[in-house]
């Protein structure tokens, strides 16, 4: 399976897998952005992609940024639809107590390509019964 990628900026870095068995391609910032404590910012990657049919790209946090700096992706996972052709941006949020500086060339998130199953919607009067029923939000214990 292939993804077509355009570099929209000269300094953009094409995403790559850091290791052969990784599921996420590293996305890299093309700009320097300061994210104050408790705030979020859109960080640009300088690339645009064309996904294969029936796939999506999921934007996920990097565990090292989350653990060491409390930086994560705000709308996790962010979804890039198959038809989107604009620049990929990542909404990062700073949950830390100090301001955090994203620098040009920093790996800021992971992009995982996943299959999409499109369904037909059927409106019904009633759903089938299950053992769980309507139990949710802690109904099976903490």
UniProtKB/Swiss-Prot annotation:
This is Deoxyuridine 5'-triphosphate nucleotidohydrolase. HAMAP family: dUTPase_bact. One of its GO terms (biological process) is dUMP biosynthetic process. This enzyme is involved in nucleotide metabolism: it produces dUMP, the immediate precursor of thymidine nucleotides and it decreases the intracellular concentration of dUTP so that uracil cannot be incorporated into DNA. Its cofactor is Mg(2+). It comes from Crocosphaera subtropica (strain ATCC 51142 / BH68) (Cyanothece sp. (strain ATCC 51142)). It holds the Pfam family dUTPase. GO terms for molecular function: dUTP diphosphatase activity; magnesium ion binding. It catalyses: dUTP + H2O = dUMP + diphosphate + H(+). Pathway: Pyrimidine metabolism; dUMP biosynthesis; dUMP from dCTP (dUTP route): step 2/2. Belongs to the dUTPase family. It comes from the Bacteria. Its EC number is 3.6.1.23. Keywords: Hydrolase, Magnesium, Metal-binding, Nucleotide metabolism. InterPro entries: dUTPase, dUTPase-like, dUTPase-like_sf, dUTPase_trimeric. Substrate binds at residues 62-64, 75, 79-81.
């Amino acid at each position: 399976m292939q993804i077509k990628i355009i570099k929209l900026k000269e300094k953009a870095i094409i995403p790559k897998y850091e290791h052969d068995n990784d599921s996420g391609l590293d996305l890299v910032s093309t700009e320097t952005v300061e994210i104050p404590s408790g705030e979020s910012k859109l960080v640009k990657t300088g690339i645009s992609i064309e996904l294969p049919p029936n796939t999506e790209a999921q934007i996920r946090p990097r565990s090292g940024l989350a653990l060491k700096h409390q930086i994560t992706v705000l709308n996790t996972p962010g979804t890039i639809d198959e038809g989107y052709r604009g620049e990929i941006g990542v909404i990062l949020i700073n949950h830390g107590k100090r301001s955090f500086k994203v620098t040009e060339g920093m790996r800021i998130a992971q992009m995982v390509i996943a299959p999409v199953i499109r369904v037909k919607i059927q409106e019904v009067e009633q759903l089938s019964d299950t053992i769980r029923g309507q139990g949710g939000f802690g109904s099976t214990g903490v």
